[in-house]
Amino acid sequence: MHIATFTERPYADVPEDEVIKNASFFGVSNKFLDPVKGGALFNRYLDEKLYAEELGFDGVMLNEHHANPFTMGAVMDVEAAILARITKRVKIALMGNPLPVADPLRLAEELATIDMISGGPFGLDGFEVV
């Protein structure tokens, strides 16, 4: 059995009325983002992934959403590359690269690079990259 951890990596400092009036929860303006708080949160979420490895988790998972206060990870491949460099053993799984808006060749190169940095294999949408 393998155990992995996942969190949405939220940014909680958006006024509740702004979130509620946008029924789809997408398209919330970035005017509410404090870059200092955002940077601290990105580092905290990366540290949480390191801690998960320290606790014995087998994998960490990342997802991607845009203009959404519930997930700060708009470019999960960057986070995956950082984790590939700073983790030792844990598998990294990406859930949902938005293929319709990505250049397929560039995405393949980015993911192959992350796989090499991590020592591979690394997971994409639940499947290991081989």
Where are these regions (language model features)?
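Structural preference for beta-strand elements that scaffold enzyme active sites
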Residues: 2-5, 58-59, 89-96, 121-125
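N-terminal beta1-alpha1-beta2 module of alpha/beta enzyme domains
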Residues: 1-87
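Glycine-rich anion/phosphate-binding loops
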Residues: 39-44, 100-113
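Acidic, glycine-rich active-site loops and adjacent beta-strand->loop/helix elements
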Residues: 65-68, 96-105, 128-130
